[in-house]
Amino acid sequence: RVTEQMKNEADTEYYGVISIGTPPESFKVIFDTGSSNLWVSSSHCSAQACSNHNKFKPRQSSTYVETGKTVDLTYGTGGMRGILGQDTVSVGGGSDPNQELGESQTEPGPFQAAAPFDGILGLAYPSIAAAGAVPVFDNMGSQSLVEKDLFSFYLSGGGANGSEVMLGGVDNSHYTGSIHWIPVTAEKYWQVALDGITVNGQTAACEGCQAIVDTGTSKIVAPVSALANIMKDIGASENQGEMMGNCASVQSLPDITFTINGVKQPLPPSAYIEGDQAFCTSGLGSSGVPSNTSELWIFGDVFLRNYYTIYDRTNNKVGFAPAA
């Protein structure tokens, strides 16, 4: 098993350091269960977004192999276009030879320029990997670098350090109680069925919908009308897609309870309201997708900080246990 420590960037992003090439160069990457490709900024990129980051220099690596393929990725808040190469990648002490990785030529969108990380390491299923690239975890598995075909996340709160992702194992010190296992409904993202969402015992949204468990998204993302219902139920107002609560009365706000695979998972206001007394926003945002198309939720870090999560590829299940 391989353990990678992650830095908590203001409770919005979690990234760890990997190395690529020979001799190894270090890069900060987000370990993202919502995508499947590995990519980093590279010397091919002259865009402003790349200038603030470590750039991978393939010509300086003796183990680099060209593939002749290109890769194009889009994310909720940005993207990356570039070429696909192959090199040795080291994660948490485990060395992964012949790993396919994207090298950015352009990184459109303002998001990447200010980002504290140099790239993204995707941990979703190979079926959604762009350019047919083999994801890092699959490649490590095929080379027997991990004991078990699962990985797990602990995300710290309050800006604290100590966050980790364990590839090939489970860290029992990071959770209490029992693990609640949920079947994956589509082997693309880590997608699960959500039975319903209640506030004060009443259904607020989603009578049977789908959710993606996504460590690379900071908020809980909801369809527009579902978010409006929940805001009404907890007495919050909206401002440009950000939900405002009455900060002084956070303690008196109700839990938002998500029922997943028959088990109630309550989210207390201390978890979904962020900020201080003067100004606060909720950790829920809108996907901009009307609910009548397909009611898809994203469980981002606001939700995941409350749980130790285990992603089991052998049995295609996600495990949730209360974080310790």
UniProtKB/Swiss-Prot annotation:
Cystine bridges: 45-50, 206-209, 247-280
GO BP terms in the entry: digestion; proteolysis
Peptidase A1 domain ranges (all copies): 14-321
Active-site annotation: 32, 214
Ranges for region Disordered: 86-109
Disulfide bond as UniProt keyword: yes
Keyword Protease: yes
Official protein name in the record: Pepsin-2B
Native organism: Gadus morhua
